[in-house]
Amino acid sequence: MSIFQYTFFQNALLGALLASVACGIMGTYIVSRRLVFISGGITHASFGGIGIGVFFGINPIMSAMVYAVLSAFGVEWLSTKVKVREDSAIALFWTFGMSVGILFSFLTPGFMPDLPSFLFGSILTIGTSDLWLLSAVTVLVALVFLLLYRTIISIAFDATFAQSQRLPVHAVEYLLMALIAMTIVSTLRMVGIVLAISMLTIPQMTANLFTYRFGHIIFLSIIIGWVNCLMGLMLSYWLNVPSGAAIIFSAIIIYMLLWAIKSLVFKFK
């Protein structure tokens, strides 16, 4: 029986496609704006929301999304309004979120069977509700970028100049921070907290081997991310390993191969 006939694998493939679109768009902004460290902080801070959700018996993904968005706003507010150093603000919310998640996880009576899937990802845990959430986030991200594309590009490459042109820089930055948090949390079932940030950076690194145009990077990142996910999911199924690790391993192998091919082409050109 082909693995494509299994419902859980079909869900994983659809989830991978949606995640590739959302991460391809948001990841390009993150890399262009050099927000990788902030995104990593938000990713790990979201564990606080998972712990709270498990403890109070609510959907951990939804509570993680709320917690991640609030953490993103907190980092932005501390660094811009309170003038706390950005790396210090990130470290504060990163460590606080992880500590809250660990405390509530240990305070929850009984065993927490979903914990490894939240940390490392699992194709078996991607359900219909996760697909609906991913769909909603992907549509929202795509709509925002379609409506605010020129403004986002201006902010991504020169926020100071964008502000001098009376563009709503701060409002758009808060909106994009919220979208980053939502995108990260919506992919947790697939790649896990530990590796989620890689979905937002490695496809963009690979796309950068061939183009530097913002729109082209988005397009290539979506395709590359989709291929990475396909290979990773197949590897995860065959080797019975966490899908997150398999996807990121495949992504890095693809990046290294393409980098080597490009280097050889230029060498013998």
Name these PLM-found stretches.
Residues L13-L18, I61-V66, A91-L92, L131-A136, ...:
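Hydrophobic alpha-helical transmembrane segments
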